[in-house]
């Protein structure tokens, strides 16, 4: 039976885009796992298999993420992109790695908007193969985007607030008034606190 899976990569970083991806297939007859549990090399190898399946994705830039956080919420933005992906789905049944605390609420919203059978589950990227496949697409595409940004702006580490290298990069950029507007999420507390500390 044809099913689709949806997952995102890059929800939490202070630097770089978020990628939301969908994969659809009758069956996955090769090894997949939650992208976070795989090495980068393993993800890339599996990506070559997964990318041969029907898939769609969106790369969501920091400015759009900031705008959503200011006006509504990050969850609201993910709802919008999940809806867009579902409407492109080649199957009637879609599994989503749930980004809302309330699985049934998100299911209801997306079912009402799309008319499709939507099943939202926490840890679906770990437990459901088609969602694992989507997580690999999203993660590898985001990794590629991050490498492009590093080739322009220099090595900023992982882009996550917990990464000391990322924090040093941000602090250096703020002190030197470097133009990093296109890559940083200004609505993140990490960035706001650093800016506040150097006013």
UniProtKB/Swiss-Prot annotation:
- What this protein is called in its record is Ribonuclease HII
Q: What does this protein's record comment on cofactor binding?
A: Manganese or magnesium. Binds 1 divalent metal ion per monomer in the absence of substrate. May bind a second metal ion after substrate binding.
Give a short account of what the protein does. Endonuclease that specifically degrades the RNA of RNA-DNA hybrids.
This entry's Enzyme Commission designation comes to 3.1.26.4
List, for all copies, the residue spans of the domain called RNase H type-2: 1-199
Q: What is its main location?
A: cytoplasm
Positions contributing to a divalent metal cation binding: 7-8, 97
State the species of origin.
Picrophilus torridus (strain ATCC 700027 / DSM 9790 / JCM 10055 / NBRC 100828 / KAW 2/3)
Per the record, the GO terms for biological process are: DNA replication, removal of RNA primer; mismatch repair
Against PANTHER family, the record matches this protein to: RIBONUCLEASE, RIBONUCLEASE H2 SUBUNIT A
List, separated by semicolons, the cofactors it needs. Mn(2+); Mg(2+)
**Which NCBIfam families does this chain map to?**
ribonuclease HII
């Amino acid at each position: 039976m044809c099913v689709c899976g949806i997952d995102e990569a890059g929800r939490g970083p202070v630097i770089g885009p978020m990628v939301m991806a969908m994969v659809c297939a009758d069956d996955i007859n090769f090894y997949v796992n939650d992208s976070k549990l795989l090495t980068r090399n393993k993800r890339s190898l599996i990506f070559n298999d997964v990318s041969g399946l029907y898939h769609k994705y969106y790369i969501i830039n920091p400015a759009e993420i900031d705008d959503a956080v200011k006006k509504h919420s990050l969850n609201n933005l993910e709802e919008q992109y999940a809806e867009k992906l579902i409407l492109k789905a080649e199957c009637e049944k879609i599994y989503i790695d749930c980004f809302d605390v309330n699985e049934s609420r998100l299911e209801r919203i997306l079912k009402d908007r799309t008319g499709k059978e939507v099943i939202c589950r926490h840890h679906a990227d770990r437990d459901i193969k088609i969602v694992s496949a989507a997580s690999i697409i999203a993660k590898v595409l985001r990794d590629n985007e991050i490498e492009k940004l590093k080739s322009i702006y220099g090595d900023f580490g992982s882009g996550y607030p917990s990464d000391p290298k990322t924090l040093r990069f941000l602090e250096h950029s703020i002190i030197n008034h470097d133009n990093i507007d296109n890559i940083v999420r200004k609505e993140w507390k990490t960035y706001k606190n650093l800016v506040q500390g150097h006013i």
